[in-house]
């Protein structure tokens, strides 16, 4: 899976590990500042049948096992914390405009493996409380821009510590609906469409993923439990969700760094 001709521009695995830690430390501070988030501790295991695990696309099975100390009750390794976070917000009585984030560890044994997907998931998971009036495409885009700003600030700070890693992100992120993307590249499959638009714009947010498009197919599968691809938005399309993708010059393809929505 290592691209032909790849070399470590940091010179050693030790420097790579230092850079990874720097990115994680910087980004969590930048993200929490942009979105007014408090870091919380999250579980890796939840009890089966409680409705707390993420069903992803509705067909993936979690790693499950009986718990001896709980009379053999079934427990599951989390897929993600999408549902758990909402329970936590309610338990903590988090006010409007504030939220939580966590460094999530999960297992997805049915994941299709490649350079960007593993059965082990280590990601930032976040959620915040908003008002009913903020359920809009405008607010979604505003939030995406804040996240993108946190990424850019992290990129620039990383460059100060590791000048071999030069900033490459554009000033602004490009927004497009999945239907618009289909009309733009009707002869390409969804992944090819992503690669084409992200290669051109470098940073893209695709709106409305999960909705059935004019070709009779969704751009990609999403969880019906929490992904809203059906609400009519201000642009005349449907969806208050989407994916944030960046261009990866090493792999020469787009890669999703955030799947999110209202």
Label for each model-derived stretch:
Residues 1-117, 125-129:
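Class II aminoacyl-tRNA synthetase-like tRNA-binding/catalytic domains
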Residues 20, 24, 96, 119, ...:
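Active-site-proximal structural scaffolding
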Residues 31-39, 145-156, 214:
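Hydrophobic/aromatic-lined pockets within catalytic cores
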Residues 55, 90-92, 115-118, 139-141, ...:
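Surface-exposed beta-strand edges and their flanking turn/coil or helix-capping segments
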Residues 71-88, 138-146, 187-211:
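Hydrophobic transmembrane alpha-helix bundles
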Residues 102-195:
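Extended, charged alpha-beta segments that form solvent-exposed binding/catalytic grooves
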Residues 107, 177-262:
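A translation/RNA-centric and nucleic-acid-associated enzymatic feature enriched
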């Amino acid at each position: 899976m290592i691209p032909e001709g790849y070399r470590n521009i940091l010179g050693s695995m030790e420097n790579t590990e230092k850079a990874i830690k720097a990115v994680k430390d910087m980004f969590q501070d930048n993200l929490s500042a942009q979105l007014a988030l408090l870091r919380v501790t999250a579980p890796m295991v939840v009890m089966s049948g409680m409705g707390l695990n993420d069903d992803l696309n509705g067909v993936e099975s979690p790693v499950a096992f009986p718990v001896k100390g709980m009379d053999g009750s079934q427990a599951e390794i989390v897929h993600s914390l999408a549902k758990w976070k909402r329970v936590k917000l309610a338990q903590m009585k988090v006010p409007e405009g504030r939220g939580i984030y966590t460094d999530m560890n999960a297992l997805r044994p049915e994941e299709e493996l490649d350079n960007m997907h593993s059965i082990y998931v280590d990601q930032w998971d976040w959620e915040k409380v908003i008002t009913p009036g903020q359920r809009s495409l405008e607010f979604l885009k505003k939030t995406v821009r804040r996240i993108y700003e946190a990424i850019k600030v992290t990129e620039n700070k990383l460059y100060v510590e590791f000048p071999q890693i030069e900033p490459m992100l554009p000033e602004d992120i490009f927004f497009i609906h999945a239907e618009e993307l289909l009309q733009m590249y009707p002869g390409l499959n969804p992944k090819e469409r992503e690669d084409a638009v992200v290669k051109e714009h470098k940073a893209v947010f695709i709106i409305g993923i999960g909705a059935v498009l004019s070709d009779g197919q969704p751009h990609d599968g999403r969880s019906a439990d929490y992904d809203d691809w059906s609400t009519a938005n201000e642009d005349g399309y449907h969806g208050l969700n989407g994916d944030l993708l960046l261009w990866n010059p090493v792999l020469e393809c787009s890669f999703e760094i955030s799947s999110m929505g209202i």
